[in-house]
Curated annotation (Swiss-Prot):
GH18 domain sequence ranges: 22-439
Subcellular location: Secreted
Glycosylation sites: N122, N218, N346
Signal peptide: 1-20
Disulfide cysteine pairs (residue numbers): C26-C53, C340-C423
UniProt function note: Cooperates with insulin-like peptides to stimulate the proliferation, polarization and motility of imaginal disk cells. May act by stabilizing the binding of insulin-like peptides to its receptor through a simultaneous interaction with both molecules to form a multiprotein signaling complex.
Principal localisation: secreted
Note: Lacks the typical Glu active site in position 150 that is replaced by a Gln residue, preventing the hydrolase activity. Its precise function remains unclear.
Keywords in alphabetical order: Developmental protein, Disulfide bond, Glycoprotein, Secreted, Signal
Protein's recorded name: Chitinase-like protein Idgf1
Organism: Drosophila yakuba
Keyword match tRNA processing: no
One BP annotation, GO: wound healing
Length: 439
């Protein structure tokens, strides 16, 4: 595999006029400290990874409904952790440490559209956000703020039979495409204005500003790329979770392929290449873009109707399989150490049953990703299909980012990597692989 990765790196280097990718943006979800058992992560356990990271993004702050001020989502934790995290700069003086807002952790069922409300707000309320951001960032010693705004998402792909596909095409003649945000153009302009005002305030205080494009947030709706990119030090594309068992419960497919696989009516934008090219083709300098890589996988529950091969797209799935016990996930999410503990290296195995391992299928094309499966038993139980990036495939993506001339890679996040070395004895194998192939 190392030879194949080196070959890919060499191939990409001659097909793109690239500079060495230098950024390794490391996200850290502070709630990992609240987990139990082996998934609980203390700040001192970050040290080994931070020798490789250029930036640490601490998540997450939230947006207070009503006043639209930036605030801590967990005051009891953050009042202690903010200072402890920014104090890491004493050990790693070159490390830039930012506070991130949103990131799909700002759950507010009473106000699900508050980030859009911020865009639509008058100057007084937007100034509340700017002023409170300045105070929270400066008071706690952060170098800047990362905007991971929870904006409306693309509509999930629907599963249709042949008759359903025909009816959908016929109906589209009269109804057009489904519109998620009818005011998207207005919101795009409002986002640009808000960022400009925020940048002006931050510039006077010598603070950084970065953007994180969350999974399935449509860049064409909200981001005026030529006007926006000068306002940000860098832009992180969370190019994963294109499909998940929550968004796509009836079919399983690669969650973060690099390239488009033009088969089985796949949508052409659900891949890394499309997302990266959109920003590059809209005049964003490659050095400002960082490719986001997930250190976790997503698992679907298989039925008897899902078959035995596991080759995606897998049909007749039943939503999310049980997620990681250690990370207490309810939506089919498993961290890398939880994934590796479930894998069998026997490629021809057809294990069944609740405690049986998953059969890993490696992507020899190095284009789409790896997956693993355990077919459902005779009663239709305990079937699992899992899409994930292991350390080797994370290295392939790092090589891709370098070959495209991007600024670097962003890992989401450190607490889902194997920070205890449970898989092979090596700690942070995904971070290490990314760093190695970034050069």
């Amino acid at each position: 595999m190392r030879f194949q990765l080196c070959y890919l790196l060499g191939l990409l280097s001659v097909t793109s006029l690239s500079h060495a990718a230098s950024n390794l943006i490391c996200y850290y979800d502070s709630t990992s400290y609240l987990r139990q058992g082996l998934a609980k992560m203390h700040t001192h356990e970050l040290d080994l990874a931070l020798q490789f990271c250029t930036h640490l993004v601490y998540g997450y702050a939230g947006l207070k409904a009503g006043t639209l001020e930036l605030f801590s989502l967990n005051v009891d934790l953050d009042m202690f952790y903010y200072k402890e995290i920014t104090a890491l700069r004493q050990k790693f003086p070159q490390l830039k440490i930012l506070l991130s807002v949103g990131g799909d952790r700002d759950v507010d069922e009473a106000h699900p559209n508050k980030y859009v409300e911020l865009l639509e707000a008058n100057r007084t309320f937007q100034q509340n956000f700017i002023d409170s951001s300045m105070i929270l960032v400066k008071r706690n010693g952060f170098d800047g703020l990362d905007l991971a705004f929870q904006l409306p998402r693309n509509k999930p792909r629907k599963v249709h039979g042949s008759l359903g596909t025909y009816w959908k095409s016929f109906k589209k003649l009269f109804t057009g495409d489904f519109v998620v945000d009818p005011l998207a153009e207005q919101h795009k302009s409002q986002f640009t204005d808000l960022v400009g005002n925020l940048k002006n305030a931050f510039r006077s205080a010598n603070l950084m500003l970065s953007l994180t494009v969350l999974p399935n947030v449509n860049s064409t709706w909200y981001f005026d790329v030529p006007k926006l990119h000068p306002q940000f030090e860098y832009i992180n594309l969370a190019a994963f979770d294109f499909l998940t068992p929550v968004r796509n419960p009836e079919e399983a497919d690669f969650t973060a392929p690099i390239f488009f696989q033009d088969e089985q009516n796949r949508l052409p934008h659900l891949n890394v290449e499309f997302q990266v090219n959109y920003w590059l083709q809209n005049n964003c300098p490659g050095q400002k873009l960082n490719l986001g890589i997930a250190s976790y996988g997503r698992a679907w529950k298989l039925s008897k109707g899902s078959g035995l091969s596991g080759a995606p797209i897998v049909q007749e799935t039943c939503g999310a399989a049980p997620g990681g016990i250690q990370i207490q996930s309810a939506d089919g999410l498993l961290s890398w150490p939880e994934i590796c503990s479930k894998l069998s290296q026997n490629a021809s195995a057809q294990y069944r049953g609740e405690m049986a391992p998953l059969r890993k299928v490696t992507d020899l094309t190095q284009k789409y990703g790896n997956y693993a499966l355990r077919p459902a038993d005779d009663n239709g139980d305990f079937g699992v299909w899992l899409s994930f990036d292991d350390p080797d495939f994370a290295g392939i993506k790092a090589a891709y980012a370098k070959g495209k001339g991007l600024g670097g890679v962003a890992i989401f996040d450190l607490s889902y990597d194997d920070f205890r070395g449970l898989c092979t004895g090596q700690k942070f194998p995904i971070v290490r692989s990314i760093k190695y192939f970034m050069g």
